């Protein structure tokens, strides 16, 4: 039999070794993190959901670093946490949950760059009683987070409608507008709670704005659980695989969706909403808007932007083989379009961005486009602005003067506006967030 004292001694030695190893590892991580901070210096925080760390409260435990699925977004330097790779943060929110001292707050927008979002309470209800918002429309772009919001919003609806009793004849418990990740998850949750529900979408099939992504685009998500379907273990997947998943979900759960239907108006009658659609009216006690930010594409406001060769999305780069392409924008959508076009034979690509550096793109995208420029595959025109678009040519201006760029095709990829007409119709108020937590003020 091994003496008890020997066992205790061995355990003590192992603990001491572990502590020394952990301390050394922390020093190495801190050194690497300092380099990371230098590398990403000047990169603006994203306007989407991201963490702000209170240095007076942070104890440097690095729980946030370990919890973040993106790995490089957060670091600990000199005993304090930092959002180092701001562009790499995609709003998981796991850091806030993991922090043992509540030093992290999740906010939208920054002091430099505000973001317009509908105001919602903790149950995702807007100031307009009975109208809820979930997913990208409310600033939650990550697929897993959007699905969770959809489910939680329906939980609140189910609780409220249960207290009210049965709905009047001909009136649904819930109308869901949008069949993207949030809308799909909300539909499943409504079915699970036994609510009478109708889900409609103006598009022709499931997936919402995901279907407009370029072919083969990598979509970032996290493991999620869908009501009536079960756990889905995904972190990086393609656009096509994600759409396939949603089709499988609908088939196996029996969820039904009405496609190609537009909302044209809404009014309140006898305590419920009567929503006018292109397929006729629908009456519902509650409405969940899960449309994503599918308002009008932002445009440049220059002569020629309405010409036929100007596009506001890139769905398939293979359609543009051999073309001279101008991409306008400095976010991930623009850079990913450049990367996709650069793989096609004969394409000649120019990327115009109004700022002097890429402030809002993921590190892998920034590195890739910079490498394409170094290889001569892409012409980068930073700190430039489009002045005029004509057939086959585009005129730009930068610090050196005016330039004429060949452009058989112009892709204006500078984001989309909120669907303000839809929101106004439902009486939803929009607020500009500048580094503030979501919720009413």
Name each model feature, range by range.
Residues 38-60, 74-91, 111-122, 137, ...:
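Ferredoxin-like iron-sulfur electron-transfer modules
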Residues 123-198, 313-358, 401-403, 415-425, ...:
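Rossmann-like dinucleotide/flavin-binding elements
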Residues 202-240:
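Active-site-adjacent segment of FAD-dependent monooxygenases/related oxidoreductases
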């Amino acid at each position: 039999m091994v003496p008890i004292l020997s066992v205790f001694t061995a355990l003590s030695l192992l603990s001491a070794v572990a502590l020394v190893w952990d301390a050394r590892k922390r020093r190495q991580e801190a050194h690497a993190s300092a380099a990371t901070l230098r590398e990403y210096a000047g990169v603006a925080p994203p306007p989407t959901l991201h963490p702000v760390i209170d240095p007076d409260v942070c104890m440097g435990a690095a729980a946030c670093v370990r919890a973040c699925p993106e790995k490089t977004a957060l670091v600990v330097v000199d005993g304090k946490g930092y959002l180092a790779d701001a562009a790499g943060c995609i709003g998981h929110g796991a850091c806030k949950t993991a922090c043992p001292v509540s030093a992290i707050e999740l906010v939208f927008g920054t002091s430099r760059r505000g973001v317009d979002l509908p105001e919602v309470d903790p149950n995702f209800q807007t100031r307009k009683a009975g109208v809820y918002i979930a997913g990208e429309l409310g600033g939650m772009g990550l697929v897993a987070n959007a699905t969770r919001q959809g489910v939680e919003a329906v939980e609140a609806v189910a609780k409220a409608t249960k207290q009210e009793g049965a709905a009047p004849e001909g009136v649904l418990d819930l109308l869901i507008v949008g069949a993207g990740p949030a809308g799909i998850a909300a539909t499943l949750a409504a079915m699970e709670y036994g609510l009478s529900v109708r889900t409609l979408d103006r598009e022709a099939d499931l997936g919402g704005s995901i279907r407009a992504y370029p072919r083969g685009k990598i979509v970032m998500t996290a493991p999620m659980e869908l009501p009536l379907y079960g756990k889905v273990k995904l972190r990086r997947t393609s656009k096509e695989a994600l759409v396939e998943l949603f089709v499988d979900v609908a088939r196996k759960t029996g969820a039904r969706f009405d496609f190609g239907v537009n909302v044209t108006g809404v009014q309140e009658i006898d305590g419920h909403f009567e929503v006018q659609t292109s397929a006729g009216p629908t009456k519902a006690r509650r409405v969940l808007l899960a449309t994503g930010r599918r308002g009008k594409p932002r445009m440049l406001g220059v002569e020629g932007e309405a010409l036929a060769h100007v596009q506001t999305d890139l769905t398939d780069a293979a359609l543009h083989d051999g073309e001279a392409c101008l991409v306008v924008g400095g976010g991930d959508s623009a850079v990913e379009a450049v990367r996709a076009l650069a793989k096609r034979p004969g394409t000649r690509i120019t990327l115009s961005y109004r700022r002097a550096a890429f402030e809002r793109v993921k590190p892998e995208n920034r590195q890739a486009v910079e490498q394409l420029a170094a290889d001569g595959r892409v012409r980068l025109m930073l700190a430039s602005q489009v002045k005029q678009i004509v057939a086959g040519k585009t005129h730009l201006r930068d610090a050196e003067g005016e330039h004429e760029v060949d452009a058989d095709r112009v892709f204006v990829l500078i984001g989309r506006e909120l669907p303000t007409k839809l929101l106004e119709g439902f009486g939803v108020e929009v607020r500009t967030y500048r580094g503030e937590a979501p919720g009413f003020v």
